[in-house]
């Protein structure tokens, strides 16, 4: 490994610890086969180093590490080990099949950990670091040493620990913010001072590993990079102990979007980010929140009318990266009560509807009325609104009443005709739909022969509406109609009127069965 002038390189190594630190998140454990599936995705994503597990902790981890070692030949495969001889020996054996193995040893260094966890003095910690890094280097050339709880460690002692680890053969020095305690200014200064002052620092890569307990993991990782770190330890979706780790998708896209500021790059194939995120969500059953940066469902969604109008003019007004660059198909214009007319018309055009000014105004009024009843308006809802608008060009349903009369049903319908006059008719039938269609035929004077009739749901969850679809014949010609409503019977009436109004318009234009009618 060439580590000369390593902390001046413009390349940031991405060390993904989803399969080790991430898996320690409650409820996120994976089987060896699941780990292998996830590791393949991380390999395809372009991750430099994959931390595959903690072999000394379980047989399952040892099996998973061995499986990954036999299959994955490009990335460096790392395993975690305590500063214990038995751990290091187990870890080295687990990595025997790996093409590019790394042994990652760690020891706590903060006064709190030294006193209450390790019960060791400064001198004992230094001796252990030297002994176990030397032992690890005897098995594998690529050794990473982590000073656990580095950001709460006295800086003079942290410098001494770092010097000893480098002298013993460590090739990467990781300074973790184990409990998410530090701030960007503090961690930037810590890295900058240590890299400038520790003997041998120019021979190794300095790494940052930040937790998110105060929501600063990504910001602290960027600050560490500014201080000279050239490896970032992170996880997909930010999963990990407690509040999680720095999210790979956040740190990667921050460096890419702000490339002119940082002048640094990664090897991450960013269009694979979303699919990798979604794979992890399926494997561990832990969905990300909708407003999660980069991979959340709302990351590229816009509902505000002002924002939507800006996006329609130029997407850069409200997006700093392209959704396609991280694996989303496109931005989403979420239509809801905050949406403006421009966004509604744009979506209707995308669905194939070209509206005149008066039509657009009417549909937008109907859209706003629908938004008072449901939170999100889908494409199916818009198509239903267009259908309703078409119906309103002829006969309009004013009211209807369906009742049982013995074994038969009775329907009373009241319509507004094209001139605005009210027309009321009743009819009986073998069921509510049969009676309804009979009353509509009497009211409009249009006779339709029913061939097929179907109903199904459109929309999402509690906002779903019923859609009625029917196929009918008139003078031997087949027609299809649809209607939607919260009420299935009303949807059926609208579907029938859809056909009837179309026939009436054809008559007005002198068109019959698709041909121009002869004029006497």
Swiss-Prot record:
Enzyme Commission identifier(s): 2.3.3.13
Residues covered by the Pyruvate carboxyltransferase domain: 12-274
Regulatory domain: region residues: 396-520
UniProt keyword annotations, A-Z: Amino-acid biosynthesis, Branched-chain amino acid biosynthesis, Cytoplasm, Leucine biosynthesis, Manganese, Metal-binding, Transferase
Subcellular location(s) per record: Cytoplasm
Keyword Ribonucleoprotein: no
Cellular component aspect of the GO annotation: cytosol
Molecular function via GO: 2-isopropylmalate synthase activity; acetyl-CoA C-acetyltransferase activity; manganese ion binding
Catalytic activity: 3-methyl-2-oxobutanoate + acetyl-CoA + H2O = (2S)-2-isopropylmalate + CoA + H(+)
Residues where Mn(2+) binds: 21, 209, 211, 245
Function recorded in the entry: Catalyzes the condensation of the acetyl group of acetyl-CoA with 3-methyl-2-oxobutanoate (2-ketoisovalerate) to form 3-carboxy-3-hydroxy-4-methylpentanoate (2-isopropylmalate).
Similarity comment: Belongs to the alpha-IPM synthase/homocitrate synthase family. LeuA type 1 subfamily.
Protein name: 2-isopropylmalate synthase
Organism: Xanthomonas campestris pv. campestris (strain ATCC 33913 / DSM 3586 / NCPPB 528 / LMG 568 / P 25)
């Amino acid at each position: 490994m060439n580590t000369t002038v390593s902390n001046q390189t413009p390349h940031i190594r991405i060390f993904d610890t989803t399969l080790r630190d991430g898996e320690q998140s409650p409820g996120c454990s994976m089987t060896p086969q699941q780990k292998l599936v996830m590791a393949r995705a991380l390999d395809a994503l372009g991750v430099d180093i994959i931390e595959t597990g903690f072999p000394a902790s379980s047989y399952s981890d040892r099996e998973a590490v061995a499986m990954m070692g036999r299959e994955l030949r490009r990335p460096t495969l790392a395993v975690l080990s305590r500063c214990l001889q038995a751990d290091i020996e187990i870890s080295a054996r687990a990595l025997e099949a790996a093409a590019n193995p790394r042994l990652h040893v760690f020891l706590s260094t903060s006064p709190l950990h030294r006193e209450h966890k390790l019960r060791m003095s400064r001198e004992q910690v230094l001796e252990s670091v030297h002994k176990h890094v030397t032992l690890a280097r005897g098995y594998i050339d690529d050794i990473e040493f982590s000073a656990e709880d580095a950001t709460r460690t006295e800086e003079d002692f942290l410098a001494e620990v770092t010097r000893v680890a480098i002298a013993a053969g460590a090739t990467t020095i990781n300074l973790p913010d184990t409990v998410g305690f530090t701030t960007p200014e503090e961690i930037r200064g810590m890295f900058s001072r240590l890299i400038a002052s520790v003997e041998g620092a120019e021979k190794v890569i300095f790494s940052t590993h930040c937790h998110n307990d105060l929501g600063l993991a990504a910001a602290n990782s960027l600050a560490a990079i500014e201080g000279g770190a050239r490896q970032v330890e992170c996880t997909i979706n930010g999963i990990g102990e407690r509040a999680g780790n720095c999210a790979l998708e956040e740190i990667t896209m921050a460096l890419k979007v702000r490339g002119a500021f940082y002048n640094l790059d990664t090897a991450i194939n960013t269009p694979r980010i979303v699919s990798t995120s979604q794979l992890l969500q399926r494997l561990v059953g832990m969905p990300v929140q909708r407003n999660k940066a980069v991979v959340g469902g709302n990351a590229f969604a816009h509902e505000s009318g002002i924002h939507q109008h800006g996006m329609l003019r130029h997407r850069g007004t409200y997006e700093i990266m392209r959704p396609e660059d991280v694996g989303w198909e496109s931005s989403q214009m979420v239509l809801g009560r905050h949406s403006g007319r421009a966004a509604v018309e744009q979506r209707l055009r995308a669905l194939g509807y070209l509206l005149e000014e008066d039509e657009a105004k009417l549909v937008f009024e109907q859209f706003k009325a629908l938004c008072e009843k449901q939170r999100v308006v889908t494409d199916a809802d818009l198509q239903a609104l267009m259908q309703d608008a078409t119906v309103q060009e002829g006969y309009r349903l004013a009211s209807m009443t369906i009742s049982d009369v013995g074994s038969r049903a009775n329907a009373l319908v009241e319509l507004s005709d094209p001139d605005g006059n009210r027309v009321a008719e009743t009819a009986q039938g073998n069921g509510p739909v049969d009676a309804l269609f009979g009353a509509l035929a009497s009211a409009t004077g249009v006779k339709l022969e029913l061939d097929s009739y179907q109903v199904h749901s459109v929309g999402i969850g509690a906002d779903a509406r019923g859609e009625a679809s029917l196929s009918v014949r008139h003078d031997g010609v087949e027609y299809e109609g649809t209607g939607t409503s919260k009420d299935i019977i009303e949807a059926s009436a609208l579907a029938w009127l859809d056909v009837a109004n179309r026939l009436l318009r054809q008559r007005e234009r002198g068109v019959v069965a698709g041909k121009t009618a002869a004029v006497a």
